[in-house]
């Protein structure tokens, strides 16, 4: 199934200004999956400010257009959406050519389905200025080509990627991308933060508790829950007698709750009867100070936690991983700062 291969990543971020608390980043994820015998490849493009998806394009939609995914983007005029739609459609066509070219690089037949991914974005520092940029490309779920931290050179993972690296160097692609990341990306991130500040800049502290799950007569699992928090960055750790405890622990990835907030849990296996020696420590910027939790037998929830677990299992089947990467060639988009994300381009000559 095509949908199963379209992976979305919730972005990390860094601080903006002294007046805007929290972490902030702008990231775009583009994924194309070939469908032999079924027409054009499926192409999906999504944009995130921090942990919030704010735009989306899907060429399988009845009327393929870039559309808002956050209420604060609905105020944008038709000129913005027309421009972003054209750019997304152009990128979809470039991805189609890229898939064919990569298939040739790896000597693959036309019968199989292949996936091309591209991720790029920028982070801001505490002073509101550019802190770092990134761009990654992947083919069939594996790293292909990555722009290094200096934004001046590339890391190619194999001989096929080295072909792309040479072409990129000849076209001064790193220089073009660096200009976009350090300037245009930062400018648009500031604009989006201003437009969505009531949502993006708020803090929602986690609702926390610890549950107890017997494994046998000798062992039990303590699970520390953090629910309904925003932004997504959070730290859950277990300690035994005040010391860090990592043995027999399990930590799930932070997951969206579906209402704009996030969920996470961390579990530890403990000897029965020694539960009170273990404490869960929660750190989140929405909390005035870190929390320390213990299991409380008298207030152990029963039925409610079943619904929570079921919800997390369902979310785990939907949010299956991270998109990293995707197009091989890109040239600086015409119009410069007119676009909020850089346009991918490709030449299949070679």
From Swiss-Prot:
Region feature Alpha-2, mapped onto this chain = 112-203
| Stretches for region Alpha-1 | 22-111
Q: What residue ranges lie in the Cytoplasmic compartment? A: 330-350
Q: Where is this region: Alpha-3?
A: 204-295
Signal peptide residue numbers: 1-21
Concerning PROSITE patterns, the annotation shows:
IG_LIKE, IG_MHC
- Does the entry annotate any disulfide bonds, and if so which pairs? 122-185, 224-280
Outline which residue ranges sit on the Extracellular face.
22-305
Q: Which residues cross the membrane?
A: 306-329
Chain segments carrying region Connecting peptide? 296-305
Query: Out of the domains of life, which is the source?
Result: Eukaryota
Where it sits in the cell: the answer is: Membrane
Q: Its membrane topology, per UniProt?
A: Single-pass type I membrane protein
Query: Per the record, what is one GO cellular component?
Result: MHC class I protein complex
Its Gene Ontology molecular function terms? Answer: peptide antigen binding; signaling receptor binding
GO:BP terms for this protein? antigen processing and presentation of endogenous peptide antigen via MHC class I via ER pathway, TAP-independent; antigen processing and presentation of endogenous peptide antigen via MHC class Ib; immune response; positive regulation of T cell mediated cytotoxicity
Which residue numbers delimit the Ig-like C1-type domain?
206-294
Keywords, A to Z, come to:
Disulfide bond, Glycoprotein, Immunity, Membrane, MHC I, Signal, Transmembrane, Transmembrane helix
Q: Which SMART domains match?
A: IGc1
Share what the entry says about its subunit structure, partners included.
Heterodimer of an alpha chain and a beta chain (beta-2-microglobulin).
Known function: Preferably binds to a peptide derived from the signal sequence of most HLA-A, -B, -C and -G molecules.
Similarity-based family: Belongs to the MHC class I family.
The name this protein goes by in its record: Patr class I histocompatibility antigen, alpha chain E
Q: Which gene encodes it?
A: Patr-E
């Amino acid at each position: 199934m095509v949908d199963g291969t379209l992976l979305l990543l919730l972005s990390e971020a860094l601080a903006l200004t002294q007046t805007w608390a929290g972490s902030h980043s702008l990231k775009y994820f583009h994924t194309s999956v070939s469908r032999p015998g079924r027409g054009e490849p499926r192409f999906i493009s999504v944009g995130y400010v921090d942990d919030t998806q704010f735009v989306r394009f899907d060429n399988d939609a009845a009327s393929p257009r870039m559309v808002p995914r956050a209420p604060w983007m609905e105020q944008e005029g038709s000129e913005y959406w027309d421009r972003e739609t054209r750019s997304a459609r152009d990128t979809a066509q470039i991805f189609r050519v890229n898939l064919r070219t990569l298939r040739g690089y790896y000597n693959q037949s036309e019968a199989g389905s292949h996936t091309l991914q591209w991720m790029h974005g920028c982070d801001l520092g505490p002073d509101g200025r550019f802190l770092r940029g990134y761009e990654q490309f992947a083919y069939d779920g594996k790293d292909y080509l990555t722009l290094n931290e200096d934004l001046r050179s590339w890391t190619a993972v194999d001989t096929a990627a080295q072909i792309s690296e040479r072409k990129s160097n000849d076209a001064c692609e790193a220089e073009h991308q660096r200009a976009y990341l350090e300037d245009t990306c930062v400018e648009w991130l500031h604009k989006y933060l201003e437009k969505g500040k009531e949502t993006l800049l708020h803090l929602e502290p986690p609702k926390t508790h610890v549950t107890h799950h017997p494994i046998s007569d000798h062992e039990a699992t303590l699970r520390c829950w953090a629910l309904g928090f925003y932004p997504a960055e959070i730290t859950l750790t277990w300690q035994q007698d005040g010391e860090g405890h990592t043995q027999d622990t399990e930590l799930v990835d932070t997951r969206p709750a579906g209402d704009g907030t996030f969920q996470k849990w961390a579990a530890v296996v403990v000897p029965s009867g020694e539960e009170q020696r273990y404490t869960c420590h929660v750190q989140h910027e929405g909390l005035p100070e870190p929390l320390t939790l213990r299991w409380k037998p008298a207030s152990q929830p029963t039925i409610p936690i079943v619904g929570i677990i079921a919800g997390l299992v369902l979310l785990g089947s939907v949010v299956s991983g991270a998109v990293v990467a995707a197009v091989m060639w890109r040239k600086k988009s015409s119009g410069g700062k007119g676009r909020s994300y850089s346009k991918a381009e490709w030449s299949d000559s070679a």
